[in-house]
Amino acid sequence: MQAIDIGHVTLERDGTGVFSDLTLRLTERRIGIVGRNGAGKSSLIRLITGLVTPQKGRVVVNGVDVAADRAGALGTVGLLFQNPDHQIIFPVVRDEIAFGLEQKGLKRAAALARAEAVLAAQGRADWGDRLCHTLSQGQRQLLCLMSILAMEPDWILFDEPFNALDLPTALSIEARIAGLAQNVVLVTHDPSRLTGFDRILWLEGGRIEADGPPAEVLPRYIAAMQALARAGAC
């Protein structure tokens, strides 16, 4: 079974407590995470990908301790950042996609061939020689997604992927996410993006405020946010 197991995790960042004894098991194919700024959403997905290491406890994804086994984590879980410019390293599209594959152990020629195959599969065979900085925001977001898909992870996590995108581009990315074979964890401020999801986590101040099906969690979340807006507390 595909599973993310978060066991008794305590996390502090810059001297501030984020999570205390957090325990979760995630097995659903489509999981949404909502919450206000500072609730711990981004910290949670960085824990799941192994980008941050907890002071206590551990995170295991499909049997891989993601903080202890970085090589294993690369083939198990991928993360699409909110801003693609925080993710793109190389100036040329082909090299950007090939980089992660080389980190997994592929030889340079095999990694480049795999990059070309991924581009072709996504209808972007003509992108290989393009400079990353010439791509639009939405195109750079797609490049980051293709780089993740090339790694063939079991889980793909998305941290506010629709921010700064115009509506047509956001809808295009949303459709691509919906069509993914991988398990998906999506962080968003927009509950409408979570239609058809299997499970919703509502984070509040580093704790789980609610956890369950969208029909149960999202109305409570929306009502709470509306109440805060009326009170001028947001």
Curated annotation (Swiss-Prot):
Residues 1-230 form the ABC transporter domain. ATP binds at G35, R36, N37, G38, A39, G40, K41, S42. It is an enzyme of class 7 (translocase). It is found in: Cell inner membrane. GO terms for molecular function: ATP binding; ATP hydrolysis activity; ATPase-coupled transmembrane transporter activity. Changing K41N: Diminished biotin uptake, loss of ATPase activity, BioMNY complexes still form. It comes from the Bacteria. GO terms for cellular component: ATP-binding cassette (ABC) transporter complex. Gene3D superfamilies: P-loop containing nucleotide triphosphate hydrolases. Pfam families: ABC_tran. It is a peripheral membrane protein. Its EC number is 7.6.2.-. Keywords: ATP-binding, Cell inner membrane, Cell membrane, Membrane, Nucleotide-binding, Translocase, Transport. Required for biotin uptake under very low (pM) biotin concentrations but not under higher (nM) concentrations. Part of a biotin transporter holocomplex composed of BioM, BioN and BioY. BioMN complexes can be readily purified, but not BioMY complexes. Only the BioMNY complex has ATPase activity. Belongs to the ABC transporter superfamily. This is Biotin transport ATP-binding protein BioM. It comes from Rhodobacter capsulatus (strain ATCC BAA-309 / NBRC 16581 / SB1003).
